[in-house]
Amino acid sequence: TDVSGSPAIGQDAGLAAGLSENGVIIGDDPRELFEQADVVIDFSSPAASCAHADLAAETGIALVVGTTGLTPEDEAVLEKAGQMAALVYCANTSVGVTLLGQVVEQVAAQLGDSWDIEIVEAHHHHKVDAPSGTALALGEAAANGRNVSFDDVRDSGRDGVTGQRRQGDIGFAVMRGGDVAGEHTVTFFSQQERIELTHRAGSRAIFARGALRAAAFASARKPGMYSMEDVLG
């Protein structure tokens, strides 16, 4: 589906994507989509994702949400929908990023807060939220590794005279430009050494493959909230 008034409405989805015709016509009624689908994949906006979560709850149709920029209130809507339908929610459907998050958590647990953690991310200039959902998820993974609240250690607003870096904080820096599909680097700093963990997306196709894997997983699951870690097993 697309928003009402979009020039894509009525077009074949395959042709609109630059592929061969597949017989799937783009519409603007999400409810009709849910009634005809086994699984719905949603990469849209926070407001649209919440509306789709409500429809998943009403219809019992599995839903994969890869939208970023959701507030805690938005996430609560998804959690509620997960009581009635299988719902996979993740900031990034890439298999590589999912594994990176697991590694970051393990490294953070081993090193402790005497090592400074900084996360740098880069995306295309059309991206509207910052830091990216993936960067924040990596920060949460690091905080989990240290067994601390992410909200207490997140530092993403540096500007001007900020004072000395607070021990234990997890810092963020953002770059926007060109057509970058997504790059994320988590760096652990000590006084005499540095560890860098990086993931670079060469194509958005990796997100599509991961989303399809998540959809296949969700279609065979009972109602509940799931993550890409669950999908990978």
Region roles according to the model:
Residues 1-34, 113-233:
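C-terminal substrate-binding/catalytic lobe of Rossmann-fold NAD(P)-dependent oxidoreductases
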Residues 25-29, 60, 84:
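Hydrophobic/basic alpha-helical segments enriched in Actinobacteria
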Residues 37:
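An anion/phosphate-binding loop that grips the pyrophosphate of nucleotide cofactors and donors
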Residues 40-41:
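N-terminal Rossmann-like NAD(P) cofactor-binding module of classical short-chain dehydrogenase/reductase
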Residues 44:
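Conserved NAD(P)H cofactor-binding loop of Rossmann-fold oxidoreductase domains
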Residues 47-59, 65-90, 95-108:
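Rossmann-fold NAD(P)-binding glycine/threonine-rich loop
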